[in-house]
Amino acid sequence: MSYHSDVANDELTHSIIGVAIDIHSTLGLGHSEEAYHNALCIGLEDEELAVESEVEVPLRYKGEDMGLRYADLVIDDEVVVEIKVKRHLTDKHFRQLGTYVEFLEKSRGLLLNFGRPTLDIRRYANDQHVDKKGA
């Protein structure tokens, strides 16, 4: 897994971040993860982006199912978005995003933390995946 803060700011992630910043500015602090999740779905769909919500992430080891996890959002079948409302992000949050990006075979992900006065944005790049549209 590779965690990067310097992943290329491509047009798609730029659009996602723009919507997230608008939501954070408009709604402010103090809402649930579900509220920000729903607002992101509305805002991203208004931008005519394809939004998948609560995407199943099948976990497997040696071909055996270990259960399911759920990624908050997958945008345009390319970018995994995880939403948090935390005072501070931890390595566990980054590992969670990385697991989802890799198991879903996507090239990149965004971790958006609405629990701070300024929206906290972290980027993840899956170096093992070559994005057909160019991350």
Task: Identify the meaning behind each predicted range.
Residues 63-64, 122:
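Short, well-ordered secondary-structure micro-motifs
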Residues 84-131, 135:
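Nucleic-acid nuclease catalytic cores
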Residues 28, 51, 73-87, 100:
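Conserved catalytic cores of phosphodiester-cleaving nucleases, focusing on short active-site segments
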Residues 49, 64, 78-79, 117:
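Well-ordered beta-strand scaffold positions
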Residues 1-50, 119, 125-135:
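Solvent-exposed, charged helical/coil patches
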Residues 66-71:
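Basic/aromatic recognition patch in beta-strand/loop cores that engages polyanionic ligands
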